[in-house]
């Protein structure tokens, strides 16, 4: 795509610094990704890249940012990959803005992704900063960086996930209804849950930690026997009653990951179904597993994952069980807040990031005001034109652009346009 750049004569280098930078991005072909053109990641990557793309492979994640495990590159004038975004930022630190530079140094503090999930990801959690530093020092090959990884998933399609521990009353009902849990952890330990109340938060955490750790630590032979028993019982009962959503999910998980302890542990987690345009966020040390659908995900710049089930990748069950916060309750679902015509903001309680969704009808226009921090823009639908004081660019599906700090953006659509902006959390940039 041709890019017409007009640098004002009186603006010089400062105007050029604020010019939008078109990016080429990295993809991951994890086996849980959707295949070929069924994958949103594939379709975005096909539009974003000049490479020959294999339509028979899974396309799981598109990474936009500076993490070394999946770097983005500036697009050169001839359309080829230039320097990495991180290298360019190192040479142009003012593009981050002073507050961001002082807080996080010369790097983008967030990582933006597109996910296309065909089958469940692992049951996992991400460490806080203290644990991340310890894990990275001890096992740098497994844990690639020393940062924490709070994150937010914004549904693009219907999106399903397991997220956080269910409320105490629901957990009591689960222990009563699923005898296989008691078989795995022992009746004395399982029955502890009936002796606690929500008012004693520390006791609740202690009991849930004990039960969950015993469950996840069961040996392979016992797990295989109990999962098979659970499967047989649910199939028999399905002839006489309608299974719950969670029970149907557990049978589906068992088909995909037979004999996996993650099948039974799913009963402990909230089963969340997001509609397009809804989001959930996850702090450090919170268990979760994405199940199906497509989403935009933004997180602190990290790739640290501790896994404990529903995967063929290496597990670290004891670390996961010891690191979890064991907070109980349904997660907050963000619907977004309309901040100006056509723009909805999703603002999680993390300094590193927020996401704006711009749904711009054909022929309409809007403005992203200048902010003292960097942004990444991703176009997922339609065409239009984007202008700043330094440039005027045509945009279309698959375009990814880096926006330097202090850059006001004017948008006009020539067809229905859907665009996402990931940036620094406004509460950090504009403290009260």
Curated annotation (Swiss-Prot):
GO terms for biological process: carbohydrate metabolic process; embryo development ending in seed dormancy; GDP-mannose biosynthetic process; response to cadmium ion; response to cobalt ion; response to L-ascorbic acid; response to light stimulus; response to zinc ion. Inhibited by EDTA, Zn(2+), Cd(2+), Co(2+), p-chloromercuribenzoate and L-ascorbic acid (AsA). It comes from the Eukaryota. Disruption phenotype: Endosperm development arrested. The modification N-acetylmethionine is found at residue 1. Disulfide bonds: none annotated. Pfam families: PMI_typeI_cat (PF20511), PMI_typeI_hel (PF20512). Optimum temperature is 52 degrees Celsius. Its cofactor is Zn(2+). Zn(2+) binds at residues 124, 126, 151, 288. GO terms for molecular function: mannose-6-phosphate isomerase activity; zinc ion binding. Its EC number is 5.3.1.8. The active site is at residue 307. Signal peptide: none annotated. It is an enzyme of class 5 (isomerase). Pathway: Nucleotide-sugar biosynthesis; GDP-alpha-D-mannose biosynthesis; alpha-D-mannose 1-phosphate from D-fructose 6-phosphate: step 1/2. Keywords: Acetylation, Isomerase, Metal-binding, Zinc. Binds 1 zinc ion per subunit. Induction: By light (at the protein level). Down-regulated by dark (at the protein level). Down-regulated by DCMU, an exogenous photosynthesis inhibitor. Coiled coil: none annotated. InterPro entries: Man6P_Isoase-1, Mannose-6-P_Isomerase, Pmannose_isomerase-type1_CS, PMI_typeI_cat, PMI_typeI_hel, RmlC-like_jellyroll, RmlC_Cupin_sf. Optimum pH is 7.5. Phosphomannose isomerase involved in the synthesis of the GDP-mannose and dolichol-phosphate-mannose required for a number of critical mannosyl transfer reactions. Involved in the ascorbic acid (AsA) biosynthesis. Required during the endosperm development. Belongs to the mannose-6-phosphate isomerase type 1 family. This is Mannose-6-phosphate isomerase 1. It comes from Arabidopsis thaliana. The gene is PMI1.
């Amino acid at each position: 795509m041709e890019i017409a750049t007009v640098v004002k004569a009186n603006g010089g280098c400062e105007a050029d610094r604020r010019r939008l930078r078109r990016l080429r991005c990295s993809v991951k072909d994890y086996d849980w990704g959707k295949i070929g053109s069924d994958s949103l990641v594939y379709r975005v990557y096909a539009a974003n890249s000049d490479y020959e793309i294999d339509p028979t492979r899974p396309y799981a994640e598109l990474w936009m940012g500076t993490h070394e495990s999946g770097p983005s590159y500036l697009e050169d004038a001839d359309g080829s990959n230039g320097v990495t975004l991180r290298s360019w930022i190192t040479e142009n630190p003012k593009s981050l803005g002073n507050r961001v530079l002082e807080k996080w140094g010369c790097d983008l503090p967030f990582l933006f992704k597109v996910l296309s999930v065909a089958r469940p990801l692992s049951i996992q959690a991400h460490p806080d900063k203290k644990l991340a530093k310890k894990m990275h020092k001890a096992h740098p090959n497994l844990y690639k960086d020393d940062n924490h990884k709070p994150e937010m998933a914004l549904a693009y399609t219907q999106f399903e996930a397991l997220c956080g521990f269910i409320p105490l009353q629901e957990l009591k009902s689960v222990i009563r209804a699923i005898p296989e849990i008691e078989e795995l952890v022992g009746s004395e330990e399982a029955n502890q849950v009936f002796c606690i109340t929500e008012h004693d938060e520390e006791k609740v955490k202690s009991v849930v930690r004990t039960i969950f750790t015993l469950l996840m630590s069961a040996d392979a032979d016992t797990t295989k026997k109990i999962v098979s028993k659970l499967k047989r019982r649910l199939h028999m009962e399905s002839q006489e009653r309608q299974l719950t959503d969670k029970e149907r999910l557990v049978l589906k998980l068992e088909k995909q990951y037979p004999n996996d302890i993650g099948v039974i542990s799913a009963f402990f987690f909230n089963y969340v179904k997001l509609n397009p345009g809804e989001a959930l966020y996850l702090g450090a040390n919170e268990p979760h597993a994405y199940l199906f659908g497509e989403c935009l995900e933004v997180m602190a710049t990290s790739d640290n994952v501790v896994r404990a089930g529903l995967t063929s990748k290496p597990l670290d069950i004891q670390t996961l069980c010891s690191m979890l916060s064991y907070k109980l309750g349904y997660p907050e679902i963000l619907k977004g807040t309309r901040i100006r015509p056509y723009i909805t903001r999703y603002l999680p309680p993390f300094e590193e990031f927020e996401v704006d969704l711009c749904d711009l009808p054909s022929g309409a226009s809007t403005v992203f005001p200048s902010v003292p921090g960097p942004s990444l823009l991703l176009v997922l639908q339609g065409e239009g034109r984007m202008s700043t004081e330094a440039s005027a660019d045509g945009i279309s599906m698959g375009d990814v652009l880096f926006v330097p700090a202090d850059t006001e953006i004017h948008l006009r659509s020539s067809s229905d346009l859907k665009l996402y902006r990931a940036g620094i959390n406004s509460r950090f940039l504009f403290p009260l």
